[in-house]
């Protein structure tokens, strides 16, 4: 019986959307294309995904901006999703994406951290080399530069894009 319950639980866990990129060492320049890739949810549950650009520690994440909303995470043709990287402060390898399943859903998935650099490629090391709990995952607090704003795109609008 416990094997059956484990198999049922494992099947449910594997049905979620799974971010696959960006990853450690990936770098994107502000003003250029940023991409996020994921493996589509085959359970049919992740049909209203919101993608956030985040920073902060693993235990105290901070939303930098909303990248897109209304993404159908079950549609594999929408991955990779491309958007314009914003101007951020600091330019560093402290950013990651959080994908949530619907506005009121506690379900989330995350990418690993990646760098956003200046248009000329300048960046600085993360402010912290380890997480508060001691894990060797560099992090820092980032935000949009100069009070800039980024408009989230509703997927399906003329400005939102995905590419193969």
Model-identified regions with their sequence ranges:
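Mature extracellular/extracytoplasmic regions of secreted and cell-surface glycoproteins
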Residues: 6-163
């Amino acid at each position: 019986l416990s094997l059956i319950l484990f198999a049922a639980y494992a099947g449910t866990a594997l049905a979620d959307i799974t971010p696959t990129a960006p990853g450690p060492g990936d770098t994107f320049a502000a003003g250029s294309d940023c991409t996020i890739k994921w493996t589509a949810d085959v359970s049919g549950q992740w049909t209203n995904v919101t993608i956030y650009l985040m920073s902060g520690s693993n235990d105290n994440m901070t939303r930098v901006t909303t990248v897109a909303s209304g993404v159908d995470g079950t549609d594999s043709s929408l991955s990779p999703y491309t958007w314009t990287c914003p101007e951020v402060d600091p330019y560093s390898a402290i950013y990651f994406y959080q994908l949530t399943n619907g506005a009121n859903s506690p379900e989330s998935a995350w990418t690993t951290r990646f760098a956003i650099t200046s248009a000329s490629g300048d960046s600085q090391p993360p402010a912290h080399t380890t997480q508060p709990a001691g894990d060797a995952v560099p992090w820092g607090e980032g935000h949009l530069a100069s009070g800039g704003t980024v408009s989230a795109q509703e997927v399906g609008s003329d400005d939102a894009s995905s590419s193969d």
